[in-house]
Amino acid sequence: MKKIIYLLIMFFSIGLLSGCEKTETKMDNINIYTTTYPINFIINKLYEDHAKVYSVYPTGVDVDKYELSTRKLEEYSKSDLFVFNSLDKDRDYAVKMINLNSKLKVIDVATGMKYNNSIEELWLSPNNYLMMAENLKNGLAEYITNPYLVEEINDKYKDLEYEISKLDANLTEAITSAKYKIIVTDSDIFKFLEKYGLKVISLEDNKDLSTNKIEEVKNLIKEKQIKYIYSTTSKTNDTVTKLIKDNNLEQITINTMHSTDGNITNSNENYITIMTNNINELKKELYK
């Protein structure tokens, strides 16, 4: 009788171990697809030891203009997890992929978020980016039942939270303590900085670009309050080009990271270093 009980206990124990192993490997060594670099950076920070992470976009394409084919969507729908931004066209891809594979796991990094001018402010604002990171952490926790793996992700999130919070503090301090609190840009993307107390004059080529706004910038240049114009690319609009040429201004290009690789040029660069450099570039005008 004792032998039978012993065998039953052993059988039950093996069953439990098998169940645990299945749970642990369910979200281990998986294939994850993302879209742009800011999402890719977070998932790698939190989960790179347990997954291979890819972008649905080919390297170097314009993610705003590129459209995924049905064949590619079918291919990506067979992956384990798709991490997307529901405030971008990613949402349409997520819907199509789920329709192709109802078992596909998905995480929306933009849950509960919104933007006012441009989608880039979701990650160029460290405060917003921290929300994206938290959404991703919580999304992973919904799929992972291994408590040790959840704890590992939470620990990595705390490290990332510290780094992003430090960026937010540095940006806040840079603007709060600045002698000059006005910048001129060629894009509304930079308007998120108004929440930090900065006056942003956007010369984006649209219906809001008035003669009065251009004259305001010219007066600020005469008063030596403006020395730089901030852009998202090296190519800017005609109005800004003329202002730069006529007034000997310097154009500063800010990396918005809205691409598959974040416009990274060397292996030492990442979201943290790029944002640190962006803040330092901003200081050139604020502390001239």
Task: Walk through the language-model features, giving the residues of each.
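Sec-dependent N-terminal signal peptides of Gram-positive bacterial secreted proteins and lipoproteins
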Residues: K2-T23
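Extracytoplasmic metal-acquisition and chelation regions
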Residues: G19-K288
